[in-house]
């Protein structure tokens, strides 16, 4: 047993845990009627091939029964203003954080951040292919599904009580690393993922 000094962010996390609540479920005083979810609705149609219904907003936990946005709702509105809803994308020149080939920052709602992150990784990793007898076999450096699920996990499950924090996408010659804010009480980071390139590269 040991005592660990908590900062304000860690204290907030403990309070939320003690009350069995999460940051994203907390209601705000922002009227949902003043915001739109067009990007979310269009993405829902594309992914599910079903029609969007505004009733989903409450069932998804994005608005309250009295028409207020939750913190999660703020992250999905078209004009997201949550400061820490950001990603930093960097393509490094080699195996370490030395010089950069490209670096870009995006601040937007979670649907667009997911798109921007996937696009950046596609643009700065190899997508080779080999010709087979009757078709072409694509050989990308990284599984598209693994990239998608990794980014979703880091965007959704990151600690949004960390003000000024953001998700980092770092691409090296041999790997892609995803890092998001969040740590155990002793400071040990828990939100870290790296993907290795296929040997077919």
Where are these regions (language model features)?
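Active-site helix-to-loop segments that bind/position phosphate- or nucleotide-bearing substrates
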Residues: 2-196
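A short, hydrophobic C-terminal helix/tail in secreted or cell-surface proteins
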Residues: 197-201
């Amino acid at each position: 047993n040991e005592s660990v000094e908590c900062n304000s962010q860690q204290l907030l996390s403990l309070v939320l845990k003690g009350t069995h609540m999460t940051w994203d479920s907390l209601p705000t005083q922002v009227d949902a009627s003043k915001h739109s979810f067009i990007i979310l609705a269009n993405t829902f149609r594309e992914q599910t091939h079903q029609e969007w219904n505004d009733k989903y907003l409450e069932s998804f936990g994005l608005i309250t029964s009295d028409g207020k946005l939750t913190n999660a709702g703020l992250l999905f509105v078209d004009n997201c203003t949550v400061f820490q809803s950001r990603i930093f994308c960097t393509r490094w020149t080699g195996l370490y954080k030395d010089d950069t080939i490209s670096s870009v920052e995006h601040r937007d709602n979670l649907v667009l951040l997911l798109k921007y992150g996937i696009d950046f990784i596609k643009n700065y990793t190899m997508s080779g292919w080999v010709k087979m007898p009757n078709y072409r076999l694509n050989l990308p450096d990284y599984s598209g599904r693994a990239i998608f699920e990794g980014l979703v996990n880091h965007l959704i499950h990151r600690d949004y009580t960390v003000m000024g924090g953001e998700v980092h996408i770092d691409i090296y010659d041999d790997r892609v690393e995803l890092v998001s804010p969040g740590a155990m009480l002793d400071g040990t980071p828990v939100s870290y993922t790296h993907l290795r390139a296929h040997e077919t590269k």
